[in-house]
Amino acid sequence: MAEVEETLKRIQSHKGVIGTMVVNAEGIPIRTTLDNSTTVQYAGLLHQLTMKAKSTVRDIDPQNDLTFLRIRSKKHEIMVAPDKEYLLIVIQNPCE
């Protein structure tokens, strides 16, 4: 568990990172650096989006799988790294 904490601290220390969260397979936040309401909102919506993206990738090619999802808007850049049991979500300010 210490390795996970170290990794999250390292990610959080990068310039521009607003917050990180780890979400379980059901979309429930396990670890977060954001406030509760923001965490619940992002976790629920990004979990749904990631599951839909994963399903779409599999529909296109059943041998393939989603490994990373990056969403960039004017305000934020959201990166999602899905695993079998968890999602790692990082929210940062987009680089200019």
From Swiss-Prot:
Keywords: Acetylation, Cytoplasm, Cytoskeleton, Dynein, Microtubule, Motor protein, Transport. SMART domains: Robl_LC7. One of its GO terms (molecular function) is dynein intermediate chain binding. SUPFAM superfamilies: Roadblock/LC7 domain. One of its GO terms (cellular component) is cytoplasmic dynein complex. It is found in: Cytoplasm, Cytoskeleton. Signal peptide: none annotated. InterPro entries: DYNLRB1/2, Roadblock/LAMTOR2_dom. The modification N-acetylalanine is found at residue 2. It comes from the Eukaryota. One of its GO terms (biological process) is microtubule-based movement. Pfam families: Robl_LC7. Acts as one of several non-catalytic accessory components of the cytoplasmic dynein 1 complex that are thought to be involved in linking dynein to cargos and to adapter proteins that regulate dynein function. Cytoplasmic dynein 1 acts as a motor for the intracellular retrograde motility of vesicles and organelles along microtubules. Homodimer. The cytoplasmic dynein 1 complex consists of two catalytic heavy chains (HCs) and a number of non-catalytic subunits presented by intermediate chains (ICs), light intermediate chains (LICs) and light chains (LCs); the composition seems to vary in respect to the IC, LIC and LC composition. The heavy chain homodimer serves as a scaffold for the probable homodimeric assembly of the respective non-catalytic subunits. The ICs and LICs bind directly to the HC dimer and the LCs assemble on the IC dimer. Interacts with DYNC1I1 and DYNC1I2. Self-associates. Interacts with DYNLRB1. Belongs to the GAMAD family. This is Dynein light chain roadblock-type 2. It comes from Bos taurus (Bovine). The gene is DYNLRB2.
